[in-house]
Amino acid sequence: MPKMKTKRAAAKRFKVTGTGKLKRAKAFKSHILTKKSRKTKRNLRKAGYVSESQEKVMKKVLPYL
């Protein structure tokens, strides 16, 4: 069986933490920021993590991460 290919679009968007979780950036932070509160924008700067239900799917997309 040939090697599995990593989906490059996903590889650029996710990093693996030391414990093996997938770290991601949060959405809704690129434009239309004037109507969002200071608190909301501050929370969007923090990292998000892939949910456990999605991790199995992501492991197929990113086999070598």
From Swiss-Prot:
A single GO BP: translation
GO molecular function terms attached to this record: structural constituent of ribosome
GO cellular component terms listed in the entry, alphabetical order: cytosolic large ribosomal subunit
Protein origin, superkingdom: Bacteria
Keyword set includes ATP-binding: no
UniProt keyword list: Ribonucleoprotein, Ribosomal protein
Keyword Ribonucleoprotein: yes
SUPFAM superfamilies from the UniProt entry: L35p-like
Family from the record: Belongs to the bacterial ribosomal protein bL35 family.
This protein's name: Large ribosomal subunit protein bL35
